[in-house]
């Protein structure tokens, strides 16, 4: 698995299938959906949406938003026009469609100023609650705007049951057998999911930022 795997894989896909819509999600894309500090390079990097060349990020857990994206594409909607789905991030140069958004500091500012970076992240952090979060916009120097829609609403009990009743393998990949397996599987193998997100705001944990409050 390469470093910056999402960027590497998206670049290869885009090189081969130039017009194919690319939707990214998961923990890497979700936590890097806007400008973010990167420990490997010790720099503030751009949204992964720009560096990967993908069209949309489905952030957080994403079960509902990915279905809505698929339905929109299936109906013939151009991927560039899918700007209305909660739990997604998209890019645009049209300010008219983001009139109601909270604007974060410009990327060129936050990458050079630690206080502005902290202020920018605070704005994003304060908008992780799906019931009161606002749409956010992050400007870049070429007039590109990265727009984060509010998080998707929590799943109902029936939806949650349906998700976790799917036929998962519930174990690690067989390739880990030679290394003796993954000991940590014993801690979670029989876990029961009762809720998502967290009411806390611990500095060392990204759970609230990823799954919501």
Task: Pin down the residues of each PLM region.
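Radical SAM [4Fe-4S] cluster-binding motif and immediate context
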Residues: 126-213
């Amino acid at each position: 698995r390469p470093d910056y795997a999402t960027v590497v894989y998206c670049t290869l896909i885009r090189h081969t299938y130039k017009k194919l819509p690319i939707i990214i999600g998961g923990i890497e894309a979700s936590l890097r959906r806007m400008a973010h500090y990167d420990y490997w390079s010790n720099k503030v990097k751009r949204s992964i949406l720009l560096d990967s060349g993908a069209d949309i990020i489905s952030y957080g857990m994403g079960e509902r938003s990915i279905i809505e994206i698929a339905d929109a594409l299936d109906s013939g909607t151009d991927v560039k026009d899918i700007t209305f789905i909660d739990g997604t991030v998209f890019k645009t140069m049209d300010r008219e469609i983001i009139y109601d958004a909270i604007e974060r500091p410009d990327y060129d500012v936050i990458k050079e100023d630690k206080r502005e970076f902290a202020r920018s992240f605070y704005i994003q952090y304060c908008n992780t609650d799906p019931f009161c979060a606002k749409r956010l916009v992050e400007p870049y120097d070429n007039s590109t705007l990265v727009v984060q829609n509010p998080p998707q609403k929590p799943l109902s009990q029936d939806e949650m049951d349906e998700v976790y009743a799917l036929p998962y393998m519930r174990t690690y990949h067989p390739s880990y057998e030679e290394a003796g397996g993954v000991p940590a599987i014993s801690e979670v193998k029989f876990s029961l999911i009762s809720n998502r997100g967290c009411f806390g705001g611990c500095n060392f944990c990204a759970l609230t930022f990823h799954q919501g409050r």
